[in-house]
Amino acid sequence: MAIMIQYQKGVATLLITAILLSIALVVTLGSYKNLFYQIKRAQNEIKARQEHWLAEGGLECGYSQFLFYNGLPGTITDCGSGLGVIPQFSLISSGYKVTSHYGYSSLVKDILISGNMAHGAIQSASDIYVRGSVNIIPDPGVFNSDGWGCIALRYKNVFDASGAIQNDGVLIPNKPPYTGFLNPTGKDCQTTHKSSASGTLPIGSDFVKQPEMSLFEEFFDVSEEQHEKIKNNPKFTQILAPENTNGQPNIVPDCGQKILEQIENKHYYLWIEGGCELNAVYTQKVSEASHKTPGVLILVHEGIFSVMGNGELKGVLFHFNKDYVPSTQHWASFEANTYLNHNPSVIPDSFRTIASYYQHGSFTVTGGQFLDSSGQAAAFNNSLVFNFNKDVIDHIASNFVKPRWKEGSWNAQ
């Protein structure tokens, strides 16, 4: 009996030991399995980070090529890495979207190519008055499911017109807002961004009043206080008015002829210091000459500026007054004076007496128009027709503004 009891105790001990060993084995195997899982997870994380870094390198590779060519490269490479990480570029309203893929990592970032410019076909810190109708092919802005967020005019203070106002939209045949404009759904401006008004001012979101703006800084990426840096950029050809000692403003004599001569000599970026008038003869000739170029920039600084007659300029008109204050007497030597300051004038006094820009005749701009003379007025004594063209603006801006990454545009997919 004692032997039997001792035998049973031995069996129980062995059984308990076996159970404990089994439990230990299970725990050990579980630990190893967890360890293997952790190792595998760490390996995957390392691989994912490697793929992310390589994709990020692809973005920087694309950016370097864009800077080198000052635009989209003709042939896009992997920068000699041998890894085949070739960035892809797609055109967007503010510049280019760059996408880089490697493995399961996909990164996206935007390159800005036009300073800090906001959307808008015509942009004005000057008060604007149009004696006639207004027809604008707008900046398409940003696309969403309802259509394009078009912007026809962006202005600081006052906009008024005596005639009908029409946003012509982005579906005009043979007049896309930029090369490569993708609109596969064929949608026009959103209804909230396509104004049509007669007898009243437009209330749509395509005519934007923005009290805070600095057009010079937005275009050139330099504050207006530092405008001399831009003026002295070797890309600019300067046309200077002779100094006037009799208290009258400085005026460039034969300004239209001087502009034409410079364009014909392949100087396409002109900084005009002092007042300037393009008379009817030279408005036509300068317009014709501009179409033989990628686009001209005519910037008039510290003076009155008038454009008379007919023509379609390919380029950017920029009027920038920082310290100059206009007077009706300053127009005395200009052809524009006959119309602007005729008694009675067709331009309301609230605009006429502070006018520093005057446009008369069937003249239009294909490109961009920037009127940066705060507290002054721009008077259009004609029906205003304007064709936004981003290609022209970007080409001109790229000569003065270095392309850069857009802040906040990083996106990992």
Regions found by a protein language model. Give the residues of each.
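N-terminal leader/signal peptides at the extreme start of proteins
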Residues: 1-9
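Compositional signature of intrinsically disordered, low-complexity segments enriched in polar residues
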Residues: 12-53, 57-413
